[in-house]
Amino acid sequence: MQYKHLLFDLDHTLLDFSRGEEVALTQFLTAMEVEDIQAFKDVYRPLNQGMWKDLEKGLITKKELIDTRFSRIFAHFGRQVDGREMALRYQEFIGRQGQIFTGADKLLQELTHRGYQIYAATNGVTYIQENRLLHSPIQSYFKEVFISEQMGTQKPVADFYEKIAEQISGFQFDQALMIGDSLTADIQGGNNAGMDTVWYNPTHMINNSKAVPTYTISSYQELLDLL
């Protein structure tokens, strides 16, 4: 199959979210005068990940996620805060984090050289994702960036991809490839939209989900070999 349009997930696929989050949380919590920063992080990460999973499943809204995650975590430590205000303050710190995985820039450079049309398809907050890309070395490789908050829908809902198709001239699902690390968002989303997928699985996780990737890779070089 000759693919023309490559849709890349960002976090954990090209952008090193874990590294960026570590820096941003430390800066944010220091500014908030949190004493035991590590204890806060240990509770925050699973809570935050769980809320994003709930969003994928349609159990909560993006607004609920953004407005309540910090009020919930601070409440866990006996401190009452305005969740929305904390979210806005945290955005300032996380938005500066454009760390990428080693080789991500060279991957996109080579794919661009080969003539592929490259797009970003990400679940996230518009301000955060746009600013993280601005602080990264890979922004220039994307013809367009599709962010769930702007789209009014998110992966894995088929409507997310249908809206992308409407905005790309000549887009055909059978000539497009969704590339990402998340089985429940990226691969299931591609399945729902009827397009081929690449599961980026550098840690060799077992697929216990219902999502069925067309291809599975563990390195960027494998993607280049595939294409």
What do these predicted ranges mean?
Residues 1-6, 19, 30, 109-112, ...:
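Asp-based, Mg2+/Mn2+-dependent phosphohydrolase catalytic module
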Residues 103-115:
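Catalytic-core regions built around general acid/base machinery
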